[in-house]
């Protein structure tokens, strides 16, 4: 048991170091040796956990996905909520939960790295839409999401929500962010996915505006 705990600690240290170095130097410019030097770890110690730098990057992305997957599993089990309500809870968890926002904030600099950005785009275009699609399909069945475009709606939420709404890509002040979210809400309403009510619009604008990098802050 003690060995397992130590092994887990080492793995977490590797991930924390890699996340920081990838953000500071860029993924391509960070070598395995840089991570080893930062931790004072042997090659064998690192390769016991991760076979390559790419494996570390994949794990960093998987960790974020795991948080969403756990919440999705819990939501699906709830029988006293409509699918539309569950979808709103899932979105709130992404834009209003301090732990998740801290994780996103820690990775913003990494998104400037082409390799990390590409890995995230793969996630946003494949696995994340699957999460939204499962709830949208449930909404079609229970009548709370009367859409004829479940696949397209899942893709819109995933790609626009994680790219177009992100202030690190498209800077905006609070008013500009709220206006943008209302635009997305209008698009989704038009295809029968009325997920963004007034409360969710305001909470989403608040959470995403807080992610604006200081150097990119837009003056009102």
Regions found by a protein language model. Give the residues of each.
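Short coil/turn segments at alpha/beta junctions that flank glycine-rich nucleotide-binding fingerprints
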Residues: 24-28, 79, 142
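Helix-turn-helix
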Residues: 2, 13, 21-59, 63
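Hydrophobic alpha-helical connector segments
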Residues: 59, 63, 70-104, 154-157
